[in-house]
Amino acid sequence: MYDYGLSVLSHYGLTASGTMRVRGALLCHTEQGDKLISEFGTAAEKLEQRYLLQCRITESGLLRCDQILRNEEGALATRGDDGGTYIVRNWYPGRECETGNSEDLIRASDALARLHTAAHLPVKMEYRRESLVEECIRHNVEIRKIRKYLQTKKKKNEFEKLLLASAGPYLEQGERAAAEMKASSYEKLRQRADEEGAVCHGEFSQHNILLENGRGE
């Protein structure tokens, strides 16, 4: 029988008094508060980095987050009786941010600002992306190669003709974007972010924000 990972709670010294299926996870009411069980679907190294970042956010005291828990063996992921691998996170009562509610959006913006203040880690080169200027220049080179190929191709289908006609305007926009970024303070901002260990987070949508007691968490 598929237990949605409920069996892993015993590895955390927890017992569920009640459960509820929620979006992509199992919500459990335990003697240590609400916990969320979800399937483990990322590389172990990334999970460790996620854990460290969440610890930094939690320790900052600026906001609460769905902190991943280590099991009694010290691991972040646990295999369940159904053969699946799961993670267990802290969870909190609250409601999702309503995008049509201006007060909710103000609270969400405040939470985002606190997240940016708290989300810092020592820089690891393997997680450091190329700059937007470099990325833009790289894409411009790719557009030139495609345009040159299509220009030399004698027989073109309808799609290739349309693509060739579009290449020029797209390249013009790309070159303008690269030039404007070079002339801006982007590189200084990026250098400062590197020095501070600022972390680029993923999607920040209403589904990822819980509001409780008038505060966005």
Question: Could you tell me what each predicted segment is?
Answer:
Residues 1-5, 16, 54, 58-60, ...:
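Gram-positive cell-envelope targeting signals
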Residues 2-32, 71:
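ATP-binding glycine-rich phosphate-binding loop
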Residues 23-26, 72-76, 187-190:
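Short, solvent-exposed loop/turn elements at beta->coil junctions and helix N-caps
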Residues 33-126:
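ATP-binding pocket architecture of kinase catalytic cores
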Residues 41, 126-199:
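ATP-dependent phospho-/nucleotidyl transfer catalytic cores
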Residues 197, 202-207:
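Residue immediately N-terminal to the catalytic "proton-acceptor" Asp
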Residues 199, 210-217:
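Active-site Asp-x-Gly
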